[in-house]
Amino acid sequence: MAAFQKAAVNQLALKKKLNKMLAPYQRELNNQIFKDVKALRVGLDINKVNDTLRRLRKETKGPNDLKNLRDLNETAAGLSGMVATQRTVEIDSSLMSDEELIQCIENIDVIKKKAEYKGGSRPRISEFESETGMSKSDHEMFNKLFNRFAPKKDPGPAAFSTPKSWVGISPADLANQFGTSPAITICLIMMRTNSPFKQILDALHDISLLDQGMFVNASVVKAMTSQHPCLDCVEYTVPKNSSGYNITVKAVVKAANVLSKLPKVEKLVIDDDNRVEIIRTLLTIQRELNIKIQVNEERGLFEDIFYKICVSPNGPCVVSIRSELTGRGWENTIFRLRRPPPYAPRLYPDLMDLDLDALPPVKGDKKTEEESKIYIFKPAADEIDEYIRSPESASSDSEIPDPRVLYMANACEDLFKGGDSVFMDIEGTAQDPVEIALFNPDTGKFVHIFRMPKDKDGFKKASKHAHGLLLDDISDHPDLQTDKNIEAFFSKVPLSARIFCQGSDIEECLKFFGRKDLKPTDCKWKREEFMKYHENILDELSEVFPCKHSGTVKDKKGALTAPHCALLDCLMFSRTASGGKKTKDPTPATI
């Protein structure tokens, strides 16, 4: 326990020293962050974000899942101003002493080996090889001799093998695709909580203050949630491949620090003039604190900053989006050592080639300048429902007919053309549903209805633990309907209709909308019976799925989970009833 406390104190002392000594190279990035938030808020599709997160939660992922992530990263990079672009990085060795240059190269070499072992492109040296000093060929010969002459023991039970997370994917294609961006993090907090921008800034300000003197962890953020409700969307349990679209504690702290007025390493901005000075400062800190980078240890704060300074293109090296870069940092970077250190050709011949061609630029910056100020506007809610139901309109001489009443009645008739069997599901309570879906498996036609909740507190609670809907998701949805419109729809359901569902709440919902005569059939499936089709259906239909659930849904452990969706549930019920057979692709029922 004492050793753990000592290590934690050393890391905290290191963080304070890095923040302080690197302060001359830090810049205010707030204006650019705010511009990026504004652009992302408008251009980022929350449905694609949710689909990407769902794919990354899979135990086994393939090429289609990676393509989905890379496409989303490309969209985010196109909307952002702080994007790292591929270029040649030169380190002027004439400004460094021999000791500094040798230490710099050794650090990069160890970081490179560590990344290769972790990425699987190079096998990790076993503890046995390390202790005996054997080469790989010696170790193989030892194993042959040992198996031939040494007495054999009972192997015991077979060890549990963990399946590969990515199948059919080169580790090089995964590089630079999982970093976080403060602008994306802030944008997603706004989308998932519908919190005012000022409230989010207040929460991030408090986090940055705390992080100046301690390490802000999950327990700290949880404690702050009561004062800052916008932090309720933070994920405390994340999958192995968490991405820049997971609102993790680390991502929130990073966003808080880059907006802080205090000295923070997140605000580092490098260029050709200060890169070597920053490296020399880091090497001074390394000597003073006796820091040694180890291959068999997790990447620490020092080596993370050191690596980014040495191999990153000019600009904000800690918070820039790096998904536009290909390969590892040392592949994107060419070190032109203009004055080789002593014995460098013998120790590091791979770094001494001074005739390497520079990498061509991948993508130019085509973004136009925007206003320096940020204005985030919340769309005004459609007030037609309130106008139609207002006392003034009821007492007026001429009643304004709602065209959606006729539309919904015709949609119901279209739904039951070609078959009387439908699956039905709702989100919310039977007397206060916020989402209603019906799906006809014979024709593939569906009706998808949204409704504003009466019980706002109950809605917010269900949003966090079930459907993930926000009020904006409903109020801005083209399928938003009033009770009168929904009653018009159900009034056209034929008596011959066979409605299949899961749970007794569907019958109560039908009664609420005036159809006491309809008796739905409760299938009473176990959850695992229909949930096994969840991923396959979304993989097939994610591009055309009309549902939008922007909120954060977390399980009991605080891990992000898929939101419940009434239409998706209907499709799963249909797939279950057919024994797993694929039904017709869903299309909306229209006039």
Curated annotation (Swiss-Prot):
List keywords of the entry alphabetically.
Capsid protein, Helical capsid protein, Host cytoplasm, Host-virus interaction, Inhibition of host IKBKE by virus, Inhibition of host innate immune response by virus, Inhibition of host RLR pathway by virus, Interferon antiviral system evasion, Metal-binding, Ribonucleoprotein, RNA-binding, Viral immunoevasion, Viral nucleoprotein, Virion, Zinc, Zinc-finger
Q: Which GO terms describe its biological process?
A: symbiont-mediated suppression of host cytoplasmic pattern recognition receptor signaling pathway via inhibition of IKBKE activity
Q: Does the keyword Isomerase apply?
A: no
Task: Show the Pfam families listed in the entry.
Answer: Arena_ncap_C, Arena_nucleocap
Q: Where are the zinc fingers (CHCC-type, atypical)?
A: 545-570
User: What's the domain of life for this entry?
Assistant: Viruses
User: What is a single molecular function from GO for this protein?
Assistant: zinc ion binding
**A GO cellular component entry from the record:** helical viral capsid
The subcellular location is: Virion; Host cytoplasm
Which family does this protein fall into?
Answer: Belongs to the arenaviridae nucleocapsid protein family.
* Function summary: Encapsidates the genome, protecting it from nucleases. The encapsidated genomic RNA is termed the nucleocapsid (NC). Serves as template for viral transcription and replication.
Query: What's the subunit arrangement here?
Result: Homomultimerizes to form the nucleocapsid. Binds to viral genomic RNA.
Q: What is this protein called?
A: Nucleoprotein
Protein source organism: Alethinophid 1 reptarenavirus (isolate AlRrV1/Boa/USA/BC/2009) (Golden Gate virus)
- The gene from which this protein is expressed is N
